[in-house]
Amino acid sequence: VLDSENSERTDGGELLKPDYLAARVHYQGLFLVFLFGVLIVSSSQAEPNDWTIHSASGELSIDIRSDAGIQFRVSTVSGVVVDWSPLGLVLSSQDSDLNEHTYDLSGGLEYVDSQTREVCDQYRLKIGKRLDNHVCGNELVLNFQSQNGLPLSVAFRAYEDGVAFRYIVETDTDFVSSLSFRLVSEQTAFDMSPATKVFPQPYDHADSWRPSYEAPALSAGDAVGRSTPQELGAGWSMPMLFEVGKDWVLIHESGLVGQSYGSHIAPEVVDNVYRLTGPLADEALGHGNTDAHFALPWKSPWRVMIVGALSKIVQSNLVQTLAPPATIDSEWVQSGRASWSWLSDHDSSQDPARLTEFVDLAAEMGWEYSLVDANWNRIPTEAFSQLLSHAAQKNIGLFLWYNSGGKNNAVTEAPRNLMSDRGLRRAEFERISALGIRGIKVDFWHSDKQFMIQRYLDLLEDAAEFKLLVNFHGSTIPRGWERTWPNLVTMEAVRGHEFYTFESQPHYGELAPSQNALVPFTRNVIGPMDSTPVIFAPKLISRLTTYGHEAALGVVYESGVQHFSDEVAAYRALPDEWKAYLSSLPSAWDETRFLAGYPGKYVVLARRKGDLWWVGAINGSPEPRNLTLDLSFVSGAMTVLSDEDGQPVSSRVEQPSSLSSIELPPYGGVAIYPTTIQ
């Protein structure tokens, strides 16, 4: 059984005395030990091989057993949501004679001991759905010894909104610590037999433009247990959302650092078991290893399961909670809104006159930034200097676009070959920082291999030193990096509005309504999402979404810099009430509430900044939808932007009590904001 001396608090609170830490009950030859929400079941004649750790409320639990390899199971008060699933690693190393040694850490493990503690964390984010966070959970660390002498620890945590675990390999043996290890395979899998539906997104086959987490998700849901069809992708992307009775499970990872690669779900799903796997060999044009190489001590990323009702899924910050805390000064980091010329005119980034129009638009709308996209380096030096001066006069910060390559891609858009070499990168950052540039957009990453993950992190570190905000495009997915590096304000990794301008089958316009209603439950749960929303221009003739739908995306989508991507004339033509809404939209939120919705069909979110609330509702379906809402937490008159009486743009002022029932037309939406800000 556990010794209470191994238990501790991490929030600075007083360590409880052993008598209060553990209550032991002897019953029919078993000791039952309750310790910080952990139930340890052990025989009086043998070492324990069964453990349970609970959230503080007891509503969420992880069972662990080790009688036939390490396995875990996750349950809520409604029942099992993830059935018994395998854990384990296989590592290898080379000695000085280049002899290969394999360490199987998936079976034949001998239990050594364990520790429990309450983990509490209080932190403030610069961007996101909830800036101030104070979170407590219970942790159980199980320590094992492998048959070949290498130790393995597995840390399990249970919070109110989910559970997580990670592998830890460390040793006091100097010789072993000096070796270079390779992660041969990870046995982590998730038995989702209890689930009834899954909402997967294919993981791209690697090519000159992918992977980029931009494949269309199956927004209508899919049967649990289906392998990835070859024509759709090379596996399933994370995050992955499952419906399990009254509960939901969103699987993801957090705390990814340079010691590992980015994971996704393997294409073969057997008996409803979804297995983690690593990058594809031909990612980054074949450069770099597909496995992870590291020295000890080593910690894997956290394997995260956000669990509960849809409100818990959408409102969760568990991915950020599990990420390493920030170590940089972030006082200078400012979230904001930006104009963006490229979507409406792909060549505009080479035209200083067009770029000036978008700087002026940002100033008129009260936005903070304007993005100058690919090939801006072709602008003559004098004209570029004039653009910088004009933006400074208007108090608009500029973002500049860069190619991440390097040998990792063959995309010719420029500037390129500046981000992959650290010396060149830092020199460029120093140069543009001196020019007053506020941020960078770095595009076309195309790989989750370890060397590319390290490049992301090195770039964030260098950018922070020169006080540059960062936007990653054509990139991997968020994994809590915006907590560790607060200058990371947004990431793409979504099939966003730029796809309106691309030829594809089916066209993005057909997919957009349901995709828009899905990503608030999946992609945008895990971190900021640069979908570049809110398009009104009629020239995008394939757009099915209404004006109200597009307007509501400004609330429904969370991004530390929200890029409004329509042409200048489209925004200037809006009625004053609509302009006031776009001018007022916050870019970082104090609170987010899920009010109603179902993945791929519809969603209603309320977000608070200070004492004021904004509400966004969208319908992803071709049928109208009537909604009953409780806005009793909102006070004061609200302006409602909607699609009423056949008018593309309509507005009215209502009291919150009058908004208990709203109607969304097919593919429609409603945006609601405080009247006092007009």
Indicate where each model-derived feature is located.
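Bacterial N-terminal signal peptides
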Residues: G29-I40
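Edge strands and adjacent loops of beta-rich recognition modules
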Residues: L131-H134, S584-L605
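Carbohydrate-binding surface patches
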Residues: Y598-V634, Y667-Y673
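N-terminal accessory beta-strand-rich subdomains and adjacent acidic, glycine-rich linkers
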Residues: N49-V319, A637, Q647-S650
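Aromatic- and carboxylate-enriched substrate-binding clefts and catalytic-loop regions
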Residues: L371-T546
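C-terminal beta-strand-rich structural cap/linker in extracellular carbohydrate-active enzymes
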Residues: V653-Q678
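An acidic-aromatic substrate-binding cleft motif
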Residues: A295-M365, Y369
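Catalytic cores of secreted or luminal carbohydrate-active enzymes
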Residues: G548, A552-T592
